[in-house]
């Protein structure tokens, strides 16, 4: 119910000129959809989203599995390390976005005059050739703990004798 009603309401709104503020809604038919598919930025956005999803899925699975293998050992601090890796997953997406926007933007530019390191003078979020990797890195940082936990649960179900 909490999913179905808003879904159909949103689909209904997509056939009107409703802007969310003015209560007046006038039926526009498929005009909104025609406008979207004629917009040059729509295809760039879809391509960016597709690339980031593919990179994210591949890297999150590979790195999550490698972390699970590394933390499936009998080292003393494994539980603390597992918690540290999983912790970013519980953060809200908006919070993560603001934190990394500050770190990759303002914080980096403030560090450059102090250190002189060129890595701090790069526009991680403003350079069109780097923004994809910056976004994937941030999302990877946030979600890799989830993938690690899933793989770790699977690894712990395996019998230990063949693994040794």
Annotate each PLM feature.
Residues 1-164:
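A structural signal for multi-pass alpha-helical bundles of membrane permease subunits
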